[in-house]
Amino acid sequence: MKYKELDVVVLDKELPDHDLRRGDLGTVVHVYEPNGLEVEFVTASGRTEALVTLAVGDVRPVVDTDLISVRPFRRSA
């Protein structure tokens, strides 16, 4: 899949060091050719909680059948 900046993506793996779970939504903020992405994850109020460099295979595009949910985010000390 070819992503571009500002695409909304779904995390397809667990990232416990960042308290990110499979299914969390993020926004592509930079594309590293050929297979890297910088993805920003924010709270529902818009506060950035994680900015992570990922491989293209670590995310998937949002599809029409995806349902959005809310969960608490554990902040690192």
Where are these regions (language model features)?
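Short intrinsically disordered terminal tails
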Residues: 75-77
